[in-house]
Regions:
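S-adenosyl-L-methionine-dependent methyltransferase catalytic core, i.e., the SAM/SAH-binding region
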Residues: 1-289
């Protein structure tokens, strides 16, 4: 199965910025095909440890046979609790490669791609939870409008929601092809791929609770990282980008800078740039796959 996973974007850059201590403890929040984990392991010594999270059971087949490696089959929103169960309270670095992997787009049967026809699933964790088909067939127009506007940043989400509601009254929307056909009346011909990318992104984020999971992981990172530890995040779209930047610059998701008694800004992280590396660090790396279409 490993062969169907592509080489991670910014592999060397992201691992280099972790500044790995060979005897340190590290977390890969998004194991996937294991590319980042294998690169981290190559920099660790015999005493080093790596904990890799993924809620998609398919990824278990990619686990390396290495006593320093510990696979955690869980959503990364439960990072702190899962680590504590394994006797880990502090780590030296955390890496997160956000969003959906190229494997999920390529595995058409999972329903992440609008190319072809497959069950409208979109669950990262296929063992439970509602599917994208459940959303589009049961939610009212107002709820669909919110999802499409908030998570897809679609210009006229109410029109798209109306198309979906109208189509499902004739027959259930069960496949990716059904959904593409349902929104055809409101799909701009000139920007069809861009529009469908936003539509599928919105539903995927809602199905998997991606933004809430990201918030929880970021908040927990403050309690899990040792002083001097590093958090490296690769993001793919503007929603993740804003959320991560706000939190790392201000310690909250609104971007509100708090000040101490003397008027000095209180920020939980210092930003890494290519010209300066600080003891407690964060780097935000925009990915070339920002514009990748499902």
């Amino acid at each position: 199965m490993t062969s169907v996973y592509h080489t991670p974007v910014l592999l060397e850059e992201s691992v280099r910025l972790l500044d790995i201590d060979p005897a340190g403890t590290y977390v890969d929040l998004t194991f996937g095909g294991g590319g980042h984990s294998r690169r981290i392991l190559s920099a660790l010594g015999d005493r080093g440890r790596l904990y890799a999270f993924d809620q998609d059971r398919d990824t278990r087949d990619n686990c390396p046979e290495d006593s320093r490696f510990h696979y955690v089959e869980s959503n990364f929103r439960f990072m702190r609790g899962a680590l504590r169960l394994r006797g880990v309270t502090r780590v030296d670095g955390i890496l997160a490669d956000l969003g959906v992997s190229s494997h999920h787009f390529d595995a058409v049967e999972r329903g992440f791609s609008f190319r072809g026809s497959a069950p409208l699933d979109m669950r990262m964790n296929q063992r439970g939870g509602g599917t994208a088909a459940d959303l589009v067939n049961t939610l009212d127009a107002d709820a669909l409008t919110r999802i499409l506007g908030d998570w897809g940043e679609i210009d006229t989400p109410w029109k798209v929601a109306a198309c979906i509601v109208r189509a499902r009254t004739a027959q259930p929307i069960l496949t990716t092809a059904d959904l593409v056909a349902a929104v055809a009346p409101c799909t701009p011909k000139k920007d069809e791929s861009k529009f469908l990318t936003k539509l599928f992104q919105a539903l995927r984020i809602e199905v998997n609770g991606e933004m809430e999971a990201l918030k929880m992981a970021l908040e927990q990172s403050l309690k899990v990282l040792r002083p001097g530890g590093r958090l490296v995040v690769i993001s793919y779209h503007s929603l993740e980008d804003r959320l991560v930047k706000n939190f790392l610059r201000s310690g909250n998701f609104e971007g509100r800078i708090e000040k101490d008694f003397f008027g000095k800004p209180e920020t939980p992280f210092e930003i890494i740039t290519r010209k300066a590396v600080t003891p407690v660090s964060y780097t935000h790396l925009p990915s070339p796959r920002d514009k990748r279409q499902p």
